[in-house]
Regions:
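N-terminal core-binding DNA-recognition domain of tyrosine site-specific recombinases/integrases
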Residues: 1-76, 91
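Extracytoplasmic/periplasmic beta-strand context in beta-sandwich domains
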Residues: 28, 36, 78-81, 95, ...
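Conserved tyrosine-mediated DNA breakage-rejoining catalytic core shared by Y-recombinases
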Residues: 85, 134-193
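Generic recognition of well-ordered alpha-helical segments
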Residues: 15-19, 40, 60, 64, ...
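Basic, Lys/Arg- and aromatic-enriched nucleic-acid-binding interface segment
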Residues: 52, 56-58, 71, 75-135, ...
Length: 194
């Protein structure tokens, strides 16, 4: 199964099991875990105040493990199925800055040119933070007014890594408005003396 998943996905799944699942069920074999145990575990997670989408993700990972054991190791049934799910699969709609809110915020970054440029790029292009952190000068075409997104930054096991995008659709070219081209020229000139 591991060869089908990205390294970051494997690390995240291990993290969830090591911190959220194993400590609670470490004294029981899978075949000893009952629906009531799952419900008690779910209630403990809910008390911790995790986001509904995170609760759903944790619950789904344990349910998937039980499904795997039912399918391939003759476990009689999946207690997660009987216990039902927790959380929700869709996050609440994101709250974006209005243009006015962004204009009011931006001057607070005037003494921090790197942060100012980062916020400008994030706001006006919609790129993800990992995509921004992986950008190189070669990804920016000031003449054609576009930025090529073809990689992402991640921190895996304490190491900085540049990885391919999560999906093929994440590879894209983003058009940038003329004023942002001018901001980028000024910023690159400051950095590289160009």
């Amino acid at each position: 199964m591991e060869n089908r998943l990205r390294e970051s996905t494997i690390i995240n799944k291990r993290y969830v099991f090591d911190l959220k699942v194993t400590p609670y069920f470490k004294h029981k074999k899978m075949c000893e875990i009952q629906t009531s145990d799952i419900r008690a575990w779910q209630n403990e997670l809910i008390k911790k105040g995790y986001a509904p989408t995170y609760l759903k993700s944790i619950n789904n990972q344990l349910a998937a493990l039980f499904n795997y054991a039912v399918r391939y190791y003759d476990l009689r049934d999946n207690p997660c199925r009987k216990a039902g799910s927790i959380g929700k699969s869709k996050a609440d709609e994101m709250d974006f800055w209005t243009k006015q809110e962004f204009k009011e915020f931006l001057p607070s970054m005037d003494s921090k040119p790197e942060a100012r440029m980062a916020f400008l790029l994030l706001y006006w292009t919609g790129m993800r933070i990992g995509e921004l952190l992986a950008l190189t000068y070669e990804d920016i075409d000031l003449e054609k007014r576009c930025i090529t997104i073809n990689k992402s930054y991640q921190r895996l096991n304490g190491k900085d890594m540049i990885t391919p995008p999560k999906t093929p659709k994440s590879n894209r070219k983003i058009s940038i408005p003329p004023f942002l081209v001018e901001e980028l020229k000024e910023y690159c000139s400051m950095l590289y003396g160009i």
